[in-house]
From Swiss-Prot:
Family membership: Belongs to the OMP decarboxylase family. Type 1 subfamily.
Source organism: Rhizobium etli (strain CIAT 652)
Name of protein: Orotidine 5'-phosphate decarboxylase
Keywords, alphabetical: Decarboxylase, Lyase, Pyrimidine biosynthesis
Active-site annotation: K63 (proton donor)
Pathway: Pyrimidine metabolism; UMP biosynthesis via de novo pathway; UMP from orotate: step 2/2
InterPro entries tied to this protein: Aldolase_TIM, OMPdecase, OMPdecase_AS, OMPdecase_bac, OMPdeCOase_dom, RibuloseP-bd_barrel
EC number(s) on file: 4.1.1.23
HAMAP family the UniProt entry points to: OMPdecase_type1_B
């Protein structure tokens, strides 16, 4: 798996037109895209199908959570769309239902542990009596037990999460900020180099590429940083 298969560019733009322009600009440099609520509700599901049909990989970031049957029905339909990854909140019953529904489809299910925009104060306000680190590890273990394909977590937790998950499950890390970039609304961030060194398998980068004056140049800079982490020049 090379760097292009590990870098996921978040299409965090409000319209299909802007998404199409960005994909065209990035060209063959980018293979993998994340599509979330903003674009889905602007007609993004059909766009996601079209991208997948063109050979791109799609991470559908829907963070599903509902009763078992509803989750299973949704996952069955998404599995038919040719998506590569799908998120749901890492609640055990929902994860087990999703795993059963996606069996044999090739869809990689990812459990969302704790949003990278949340810190201990945010969790306490929401009624959780655990710090982000402890909750991430607990949900990672629950995802492994449910048979999920991987989890989404901050790169700051990736090393310990890898110990929980073992060598084969995916660790997808948002909140990635290239060296020298602004953190935005993310509270638990890491550079591409450090995230891969910590054990992440896939990195989600949106704003530093999408909002860059030259998105293709920004994407190549991230890819180069990833290559340096995986294949250091002096080795």
């Amino acid at each position: 798996m090379d760097a292009r298969e590990r870098l996921i560019v978040g299409l965090d733009v409000p319209t299909i037109g802007e998404a199409e322009k960005l994909v065209s600009t990035l060209g063959d440099d980018i293979l993998f895209y994340k599509i979330g609520y903003q674009l889905v509700f602007a007609g993004g599901l059909e766009f996601a199908r079209d991208l997948a049909a063109s050979g791109k990989k799609i991470f559908l970031d829907m963070k599903l959570l509902d009763i078992d049957n509803t989750v299973a029905s949704g996952v069955e339909n998404i599995a038919r769309m040719g998506m590569s990854m799908l998120t749901l909140h890492a609640y055990p019953k929902a994860m087990r239902a999703a795993v059963e529904a996606a069996a044999g489809s090739g869809l990689c299910l990812l459990g969302v542990t704790v949003l990278t925009s949340m810190d201990a104060e945010d969790l306490a306000e929401a009624g959780y009596n655990q710090d982000p680190h402890s909750l991430v590890l607990r949900r990672a273990e629950q995802a492994r037990a449910a048979g999920m394909g991987g989890i989404v977590c901050s790169a700051a937790e990736a090393a310990e999460v890898r110990e929980v998950l073992g060598p084969d499950m995916a660790i997808v890390t948002p909140g990635i900020r290239p060296t020298g970039s602004d953190h935005g609304d993310q509270k638990r961030v890491m550079t591409p180099f450090d995230a891969l060194k910590a054990g992440a398998t896939h990195l989600v980068v949106a704003r530093p590429i999408v909002k860059a004056p030259d998105p293709r140049h920004a994407a190549r800079a991230v890819l180069n940083e990833m290559v340096a982490a995986r294949w250091p020049a002096n080795r």
